[in-house]
Amino acid sequence: LKVYLIKSKNTESGTIETLPEFEQLQLIDDSNIELKSIFENNKKIAIISESSIDIILATLQESNPKRKAIELFKDKFIFRKLIKDENFKIHKIDFQDIYQLKIKNKSVLKPLKGCFGTAVKIIDEYTDLQKLQKEIRKELEKNSTVFNENVLTLNEFIVEDFIEGQEYAIDMFYNSDGKPCIVNIYHHPIPKYEQYLHMIYYSSKNTFNEIYPLAKSFFEQLNEKINVTDFPMHCEFKLIGNKLIPIEINPMRFGGMGLGNLTYYSFNINPYQYFLENREPNWSEIFQNVDDDLRFVYFIAYNAFSKDKNTNYPNIQKLKNEFTNIKLEQLFDYQKQLAFGVFCLQENEENLHRLLQIDFDDYFEPIL
């Protein structure tokens, strides 16, 4: 038995480089001619890049519940109807029309398909939309060199209601019986500088205690509607009161950016092994001896926002001096990527708060 990991040439940095050593894990390129037979003959398949979506849909038969679920989650309009969230308003808009938007309430403007927080903007009636449109154009030009149109749409945008509340992410799968198995829960605090939106995700005892029962209940109810088995997903929620409101459910980026591998470097739990073995980690046992103040952090070291990466380079040691306990360090070619590395850390609450104030411009220095 194996877990097949479907990757593409546009797979995000960090996803593969941080994978746990696991003999029963096999990486398959989405252009592999065997792809159709792999899907027909194997149950344990995880897709790790949104840019594979067209190939995956073409490979799966129309009647396949997995295909139906992927299409459903891809279309944010149908998805909202499915979860009966009529209060949540969402509509499409072309990039060129952004400056004409009439905004009454706080809203989120973002590309229809997006990645890495690119061009995600919180707007309200006071936003200077012409100025914002120019900023977005600049950001899209910069990031579209790394992502293709399958992953980052340049012209199609959506405007949706802004949901107040803390943000959480969950990596999970439905096992062979369709039961939800949660392999990690993260709090996603918003950093001081929103251009580094995905800088920090962390797990903690309190996060699990608060979110786990709500998530379990949500996923059980969801599968009464989508009826999938052996189906891994990455999900994002806002917590309002004691209700989880889904922001995104994405079966195309399980473990994307390497976030799903944090659980391995924190608790020695290999999410792919649990997927293969159809089981969930015993979280109450895992957290039994964990200090309440301990934060297991996935840290994305972004490139500087306003310094040219052709004339500046990251001072990695300066950044590392900010950390308490590094469990994993994985560096990238910052000239080709939007970040220069990812780190798995163990921090306390106080230092975590300090890390959220980071401006990566301060960690880039002139190439002499």
Residue positions per predicted region:
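ATP-binding N-terminal substructure of ATP-dependent carboxylate-amine bond-forming enzymes
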Residues: L1-I70, E347, R354-L368
